[in-house]
Amino acid sequence: MRQNMSILPPSSFSRNFLLVRCSPIQVWKYSMNTLCTMHGWMKLYLEYQRWNCMLRLSASIELEVFMDVPIFIRTYYRPANMDDSFRYGIIFRMYDLAVQLQWGNVMKLLLVTKTQVEKKKALNLNVSKTRDGRGGLNQQG
């Protein structure tokens, strides 16, 4: 008589065992936290690239469109320096500065004459800066 052979694996034989034993080694090289971080970063990166391509396809581009840039981080890990000028550029920093000054005092910032630069250099040459014992600057004239 034939024995009744079961196709199902024994109860101790779990699905997780199959996943761990049969998958390539590279799948488990990174931790789940790293994979989730990369996944989120990739979504942000692709959203930025989509925005950039759609912007380049349009025939007429207004300046306000550049103010609504999606968040874009260059790397999935935190870089050593978080520079806002990479995202916004220098022109946007100047725009923010002009708005903070309420457009009235902008010309005071832009007008720098040669004599003002020479006066500042002369001041810097006359003041020698040395370190005091507490880590601060000790100015002697």
Curated annotation (Swiss-Prot):
A stretch of 270 kb of the mitochondrial genome is duplicated within the centromere of chromosome 2 resulting in the duplication of the gene. The expression of this duplicated gene (At2g07708) is demonstrated. The keyword Mitochondrion applies. Its main location: mitochondrion. GO terms for cellular component: mitochondrion. It is found in: Mitochondrion. Keywords: Mitochondrion. This is Uncharacterized mitochondrial protein AtMg00500.
